[in-house]
Amino acid sequence: QEILPESGGREVDQLARLVEAERDAALAPDAMRRMAALLPPIVPVAEAVAARLRLSRAQRDRLTCVARRDTEDARHPRGLAYSVGIECALDRLLLAGADTSPLKGWEVPVFPLKGGEIVARGVARGPEVARLLQAIERRWIDEHFPSRARVVEMLDESLHDG
């Protein structure tokens, strides 16, 4: 009986590429990352394997995060890391054969705008505040995490346009 019957030739080849990518990036081997390489990028498969192997919640979450990998992941590595965390972003980039150097030594920033600041500008509490926060946060990510001053400009622009 196989331990990972979900693995096929493509996944074994992917593991070989991952081992090489880890070496090239001077990263220590990582068992969970390597297990993720042996699974197809299908969330229910990752969940089933995690349950069958009785993995911890953190390990399950990591496998499912990696299973959500996408061909667009490498376009904005730091945006990916902001969304899914550095560990999962690193896993996904390595599996994609993408450059991981943008994440080296980088810390995930905190979005520098709060809903209360929008309310203080005269917007009523509720869905409009949430919509503005989400729109400005998307722009902040797309602009590669500019300063708080730029975020305030974005807010001003959004309030002026809205």
Where are these regions (language model features)?
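Charged substrate- and nucleic-acid-binding regions of tRNA-handling and nucleotidyl-transfer enzymes
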Residues: 91-162
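Conserved, hydrophobic alpha-helical core segments of structured domains
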Residues: 1-98
